[in-house]
Amino acid sequence: MPNYHVTLQAAYIVRNVDDVEDAISVTISQIGKMLNKEGLNYVDIDIGLTICPKCGELVDCVLVVARTALVGVLLSMKVFNAESPEHAIRIAKATIGKVLKNIPLEPVDVVELEK
């Protein structure tokens, strides 16, 4: 059975932040602590990117309003011995979703790894 690299997107809310950089730092720290506490230190955490509608540049996927931020997070992991890409997504969502309860997870990318 093939191995896959699965990337999921999550929407994470952070309170009491001053700016975008603060929101990013707090998000990575909080999610990292939750994942590491459950032994999921193999999950990679990145901040998503979006295209600025005005200038067309890539910017961090973070919105801060009234010291509350909505942060787009990318979580990726390798899934071994999955039957199909869809099966790999289900495994990744179940593994990460056990720790990040009540946080929506959507697949962004699935790549079959070469042996």
Swiss-Prot record:
It comes from the Archaea. InterPro entries: UPF0212. It holds the Pfam family DUF555. Belongs to the UPF0212 family. NCBIfam families: PRK03922.1 (NF003035). HAMAP family: UPF0212. This is UPF0212 protein MJ0068. It comes from Methanocaldococcus jannaschii (strain ATCC 43067 / DSM 2661 / JAL-1 / JCM 10045 / NBRC 100440) (Methanococcus jannaschii).
